[in-house]
Structure formats: structure tokens, C-alpha cells
């Protein structure tokens, strides 16, 4: 329960409110709840996939999951629309956002802490096909994929790069100078047909 008591007549705007626990699994800053992470640990998973599902694509590419927005101080991470915010017209959630409170740095730490191989999932230049079907305007043309390819390369460097590299240094500055030993990378989520295949 969060309780904020204010006195006076001026208005107050709260920019960032977090109810993340302080007492986290392995005492990680901005880490997972102890009970949830312990349950994951007790299952001995071989692989931990993140992020899951259609959130990778977003309902449009503007709202796709972008890993670079999920690192750095939590209070500086931007909000993003959630893929499920307006998918079903009978079930609108206009205030349902992603906070990126759990980002890729915390994800890599969690995988390490529970002994699982991380399997990050990155966008392949396609918005959610279920929502956009085969509308080519909802997807990046194949000859314009370079920024998406670079995001994949940068994530690999963030996870495994030496501390003298741009993204390896960022990882070290966040408190983890040793590489995370990333071995796997998924590109795209639940896509199909030639729109997807031509991007591989």
C-alpha cells in the first residue's frame, strides 16, 4: 500500500512512482521479488526468454519493445504503450503501459542468478501480424532493416562485450563488468509467411 499525504493548496505532479520491493532476490537493486525469483530458481529452467510474446512487436513499430529504452536509471526509462492496451475493443485499457521497470539489465542478472541461459527476443522490423495481418505498411521494408540489425548487434555487445566497447562499458557502469555470456538470440516473435522469412 502506498500512501501519499499532501498539505497545502498547490498542485503536485508525480513523474515516477515505483512500488518495486527493496528486499529482492539476491539483494539486486531493482531486482525481482524474492518469492517469485525463488520459485523460478526452484524450477531449474534451462532457458529464460524475455520479453515474452507480442510485446516484442507492439501494435505498431512505434510501440515495439526497444531494449535500449529498458536500461539505465529506472526513473529515466520512458513509458511505452502496451501491446494489449487496445487490442480488444470490448476490453480497453487506456492506461495500461509498460514501465520498463524490469529491463534487459535486470533480465540478464535474473537469468544469471537462477542459472538459466538468457534468450532475448528482438524485433525483426515487423509490427504484430495478428493485429496488422499482412499489411506491408505496418512493417519495415527489407532494405531498411539496418537499425534493427544494429540493435541486435548492440545487445550482443551489451551482454558480452569488453568494457572498452560502448555497450560493454554501459553494462559495467550499471554494475556488471563481467560479460553475461549470452549464447542465444531470438529475432522476431510468432511471425509467419514470406514477410517474416525474407527478413531472416
Protein language model regions, located:
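Non-catalytic accessory regions flanking glycosidase/transglycosidase catalytic cores in CAZymes
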Residues: 1-200
